[in-house]
Amino acid sequence: MSVISATNREKIFDPESGELLHEVIRPLSMTSSITTVRREDFSDPSEFLQAAIIEIPPNHSFAPHVHLERERTFTNLRAQETWVVMSGRVEVTFYTDKGVLISKAILEAGDLSISFKGGHGYKTMTSDALVYEFKSGPYEGQEIDKVFIKID
């Protein structure tokens, strides 16, 4: 069984504020011999959406557990979104909160994008494009969740 042994991370910042808006993560290499659990976190602990990659050796188990319900307070919470490309190719465009295009990337199988802030758009490039999408909720409808960026 092959596992990911390293990742290539492209962080995309707001050119005005320097704030991290988006990230593209790609697997770099694969190895068939892993002996210990290794974890690479992609999100700052303060972000609502947490993402990581975990390398797991054969026959390793994680103890069954339940995550505790607790009161949390978030202010000015926006939806954060991740796309994981399972097959095919997808072009992703990244924007600032003001709708300024700041970067583009081609995602292939195994790649993922995270949008913490700012805007994004996706365009499939192959007929076999299949993605997983994860976003923070609760989802209250398009009218409340997003505003579309005008593209010239």
Predicted regions and their residues:
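A short, N-terminal "cap"/entry segment at the start of jelly-roll beta-barrel domains
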Residues: 1-57, 151
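Short beta-strand His + acidic residue motifs that chelate non-heme Fe in jelly-roll/DSBH
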Residues: 64, 92-93, 113-115, 120-126, ...
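Conserved short histidine dyad/triad with adjacent acidic residue
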Residues: 53-78
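Glycine- and acidic-residue-biased ligand/ion/polar-headgroup-sensing regions
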Residues: 57-58, 77-95
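Short acidic-glycine-tyrosine-enriched beta hairpin
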Residues: 96-117
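Double-stranded beta-helix
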Residues: 121-152
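Short beta-strand segments in beta-sandwich/barrel cores
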Residues: 52, 60-63, 88-94, 112
